[in-house]
């Protein structure tokens, strides 16, 4: 059977103060009253049954997840006791699916992306399922066909086409986020896709890869499934590492018996990682300011202005250029746009000097 796991962990620190530890970005109802999590679920409707959709999130967010997706059975919401990077969410989820269905094929999708059109996404995901079902040793990643030399995404280098499928290729190598000139060369070559961070595989195949690469992790997630009452004891033993570093990159380099393949996603895709990507969804005024909420500007241009307090509050600026201003009821952020990637550092200082309730 086919399963989908929505990965909805993380605190979304780069979107502070909109996103907080107690209310991370995937739960914020910023998009016409819907959250990124709800939108991720709705993209799956008609593709798999609700009984086969799971969400892996932080334990502290499990209640909110259940409220936002009431269609899911309670046992399909997996609450991590602590965040330990993407591999462990993936590995635990795969172990849960394998325990329920040894023949289960599972897609790991993320809850922090905007994807249109949905029917094209479903078509590509269905192809990835078909590939994983037909080729038991396949690790199938989804690659977004790039439309610009984006420097904020990782890339994958595709090689020869896989016979019997359309828009399916072998992956030669994974690439880190490039500088502008290198990203342009990737785009010009036509051989590189953006790494969407979504994969499809047989649950037992992923666990078999971990047996080869990280046997302690494989053994621990199996033990968690066998003895769920011990999760608080066992989960902290898992190594903090991403699934790309732990599995996908070694497999693509031939260090395991798996084949790494990719299915093309020809979609409008935005990974909502920080304010620069979020601003792409906002309305821009005649001065190039991306605005959300009630704002007034004077001699200000190229800014990102967010008023999350409400209609009884106004954010007003004078003489700002390329600035970021985010106002919430309990915290306000003012920064240069070029420093937006440093918000993590700032949040650590806020936690230390102002208190955890503001972080």
Regions found by a protein language model. Name each.
Residues 54, 106, 172, 191, ...:
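A residue-level structural signature of the nucleotidyltransferase/glycosyltransferase Rossmann-like core
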Residues 37, 93, 112, 156, ...:
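Residue-level signal for inorganic ion chemistry
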Residues 1-3, 50-51, 73-74, 101-104, ...:
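Short coil/turn connectors at secondary-structure junctions
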Residues 203-359:
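Left-handed beta-helix
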Residues 1-7, 13-24, 29-126, 134, ...:
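Conserved N-terminal catalytic core of the sugar/cofactor nucleotidyltransferase
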Residues 117-221, 225-233, 259, 336-337:
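Conserved core of the sugar-phosphate nucleotidyltransferase
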Residues 83-88, 148-150, 180-182, 268-270:
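A short acidic, often aromatic-flanked loop/helix-cap motif at beta-alpha or helix-coil junctions
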